[in-house]
């Protein structure tokens, strides 16, 4: 069983040398995740939410006013700009591709997008890789 400390090098090795037999189930899972992301951003992510819930992903917001509006809603909330929606789509795609490469490089991925709850606050974890909880992030040097 592989360990997470070799993960980056194993992915780079896969990218450099390829594989003779990519696992179809990994490819189909990645494609399905990307389709789901597009549906979420294009069809269900087009309007601001009326009223939300306290979630693990928003609990750490430094602005308590923004957190209040996340939970209580704001009829005048700004719609997401096309540029912001594109960032969310790219982030979702990057997560799907990275987790595909993790699997294809021989590492164990479990609990993808598993819902968790702590003291009544719900959230989703990105994945557990080789027994380690991970959060997949994409970033740009441009801010």
Go through the PLM ranges and name each one.
Residues 1-133, 139-143:
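Metal-dependent nuclease catalytic cores that hydrolyze phosphodiester bonds in DNA/RNA
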């Amino acid at each position: 069983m592989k360990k997470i400390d070799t993960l980056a090098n194993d992915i780079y090795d896969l990218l450099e040398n390829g594989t003779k037999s990519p696992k179809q189930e990994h490819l189909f899972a990645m494609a399905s995740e990307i389709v789901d992301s597009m549906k979420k951003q294009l069809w269900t992510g087009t309007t601001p939410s009326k009223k939300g819930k306290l979630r693990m992903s928003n609990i750490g917001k430094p602005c308590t006013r923004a957190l209040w509006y996340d939970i209580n809603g704001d009829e005048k909330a700004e719609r997401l700009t096309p540029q912001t929606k594109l960032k969310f789509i790219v982030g979702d795609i990057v997560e799907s591709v990275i987790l595909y490469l993790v699997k294809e490089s021989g590492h164990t991925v479990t609990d993808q997008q598993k819902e968790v709850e702590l003291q009544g606050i719900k959230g989703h974890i990105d994945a557990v890789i080789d027994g380690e909880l991970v959060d997949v992030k994409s970033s740009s040097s441009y801010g």
